[in-house]
Amino acid sequence: MEDFVRQCFNPMIVELAEKAMKEYGEDPKIETNKFAAICTHLEVCFMYSDFHFIDERGESIIVESGDPNALLKHRFEIIEGRDRTMAWTVVNSICNTTGVEKPKFLPDLYDYRENRFIEIGVTRREVHIYYLEKANKIKSEKTHIHIFSFTGEEMATKADYTLDEESRARIKTRLFTIRQEMASRGLWDSFRQSERGEETIEERFEITGTMRRLADQSLPPNFSSLENFRAYVDGFEPNGCIEGKLSQMSKEVNARIEPFLKTTPRPLRLPDGPPCSQRSKFLLMDALKLSIEDPSHEGEGIPLYDAIKCMKTFFGWKEPNIVKPHEKGINLNYLLAWKQVLAELQDIENEEKIPKTKNMKKTSQLKWALGENMAPEKVDFEDCKDVGDLKQYDSDEPEPRSLASWIQSEFNKACELTDSSWIELDEIGEDVAPIEHIASMRRNYFTAEVSHCRATEYIMKGVYINTALLNASCAAMDDFQLIPMISKCRTKEGRRKTNLYGFIIKGRSHLRNDTDVVNYVSMEFSLTDPRLEPHKWEKYCVLEIGDMLLRTAIGQVSRPMFLYMRTNGTSKIKMKWGMEMRRCLLQSLQQIESMIEAESSVKEKDMTKEFFENKSETWPIGESPKGVEEGSIGKVCRTLLAKSVFNSLYASPQLEGFSAESRKLLLIVQALRDNLEPGTFDLGGLYEAIEECLINDPWVLLNASWFNSFLTHALK
């Protein structure tokens, strides 16, 4: 084959093909079929442009014998065959001078008469299959596709063949000749099959025995055998009308494919009702920390010791009182529980040696708060299977809730920078291979952008709380253990800092299954007055427990300090995921990496440095009612991280359903934006599936409202 290529093609074409293959690390001596294919493609591109000119009047003309005096301009710019850098330079300059949209992939030609890029394809298979592959790959309405086959067939975008009949006939004749020359040397079959990696094993592979029986059993209805089904699938023409095919497949299906136009989609309907309430496992933007810098006390690192040390930094404690009762709870019990914590911490200090853990006395208020003896008695199924009216509890439908503004504020806060660093460089893992110097560079840049982010604080807080709670649940199953909520960070000056957010008291925790629940009471410090947004704090009982002096621009001011208390519960599986919240860093890093990769493949060099250091460039972050929001690369990193963290903090079945179903609608809208003329059936059913997930979850409702903003802007 190699000899044939060198005899059959012009030496210039052969040289260009060798160069192209070497650029991709391929050897023309080994991959001879590929060598022949590249030469053929190059020759077709050159023949396409040969003899076609534009005269001084701008008309397209064909000139076969050169008149040296004519002022003629080549009609086609040849891009194929140039090295990649040069090719992109040509494409960029064409785009700059003509205003044509820049293609994502290098095209083969540019047509100055029709003002469009052309992608030429030469296939040994059926033209329409190859055409669809090309169209799917380049996904651009602007680039014109023209496919030729060795059998004389052709296919072009909108059946617009660009060239006159004669020029195309010349190309087809040449392809036919190449095919005959190959066939006469016994090279054609191997060449023809190499395009598809054809002759799949399956064709010669006999399925026998159990596999054969399973195959026959799992056929769709109305097919008697595997052969019968296979023949049907092979003959299934993809370009027929879909409705007909569907009815052919099953008598029950009658889908009408409706075109999806800019006017088709409507906004998602968000539920009405009282505003939604906070449901995270710990306070986010409203949390307050009692902190010690450069901790060096005895027992530093033992949570209880650290907590007592942090509590001692505050001098404004006062007699607690309830400022926002919990609607359904016995609020006095919350008050008594906090007083009990203060008293028992005081007792610890009076002991000679402070213990490492503290189990609370099982008082009536804690038993109430932790649901002790509240679980219905379990009865063996054998003893009750004869009971006639055995049934599951009736559970109430959840009450629909409307979107409240606090959840957007929470998200905005999560994207902000704090004045402390919450992760060290190695939180994302170490290098293990040489390729990873680029990876570590990206990781270090990314870490620098997110280490001070509030979402990162939430990650470390979540990891700490879940780890401590899971440990205590396994180690002290019957005890009401007091668990401090702690995090560690570094100040701007690099000093270590230990923070106390409040406490958790866990209930009995005999967790056999992943989903068995452990109850706990959380009590968290805050400066937020709950009376400002009472709907947000529906599930909480809030006490006022002290006054804090704050330094402000106008000097010291005293602010009331609140304690947010609620009963809550979690399970082994939820704690396991909570302990792995650092994965959010990895997920958002990967999203940023794919942005860098896209940029690098266009520029054909690694763009990591430019990506993070070009401070002037802005990137799309998301859609708001105002339009597409843009920001620095750091802001993009922090926003992606915050989204990932909120997906973890507010994980729920509603979120799972909304993400899966709304993604389908998103893909349809994106297809419309890319002018792919999408069609849909049962769009109403899709809307129903999305909207049945919009019930009362704040994070899901916020995502739905973002989705509506996206719809508005995408369809303008």
UniProtKB/Swiss-Prot annotation:
BP terms from Gene Ontology: cap snatching; DNA-templated transcription; symbiont-mediated suppression of host gene expression; symbiont-mediated suppression of host mRNA transcription via inhibition of RNA polymerase II activity; viral RNA genome replication; viral translational frameshifting
Nucleotide-binding as UniProt keyword: no
Modification after translation, per record: Phosphorylated on serines and threonines by host kinases, including human casein kinase II.
Chain positions of motif Nuclear localization signal 1 (NLS1): 124-139
Binding site for Mn(2+) 1: H41, D108, E119, I120
Entry keyword annotation includes Transferase: no
Compartment(s): Host cytoplasm; Host nucleus
Taxonomy, superkingdom: Viruses
Keywords: Cap snatching, Endonuclease, Eukaryotic host gene expression shutoff by virus, Eukaryotic host transcription shutoff by virus, Host cytoplasm, Host gene expression shutoff by virus, Host nucleus, Host-virus interaction, Hydrolase, Inhibition of host RNA polymerase II by virus, Manganese, Metal-binding, Nuclease, Phosphoprotein
Gene Ontology CC terms: host cell cytoplasm; host cell nucleus
Record note on cofactor: Binds 2 manganese ions per subunit.
Cofactor(s) demanded: Mn(2+)
Motif interval(s): Nuclear localization signal 2 (NLS2): 184-247
Main location, first listed in the record: host cell
GO molecular function, one term: endonuclease activity
EC number: 3.1.-.-
Residues the entry annotates as binding Mn(2+) 2: E80, D108
Quaternary organization: Influenza RNA polymerase is composed of three subunits: PB1, PB2 and PA. Interacts (via C-terminus) with PB1 (via N-terminus).
Family, per entry: Belongs to the influenza viruses PA family.
Described function: Plays an essential role in viral RNA transcription and replication by forming the heterotrimeric polymerase complex together with PB1 and PB2 subunits. The complex transcribes viral mRNAs by using a unique mechanism called cap-snatching. It consists in the hijacking and cleavage of host capped pre-mRNAs. These short capped RNAs are then used as primers for viral mRNAs. The PB2 subunit is responsible for the binding of the 5' cap of cellular pre-mRNAs which are subsequently cleaved after 10-13 nucleotides by the PA subunit that carries the endonuclease activity.
Name this protein carries in UniProt: Polymerase acidic protein
Species of origin: Influenza A virus (strain A/Chicken/Scotland/1959 H5N1)
Lineage: Viruses, Riboviria, Orthornavirae, Negarnaviricota, Polyploviricotina
Gene: PA
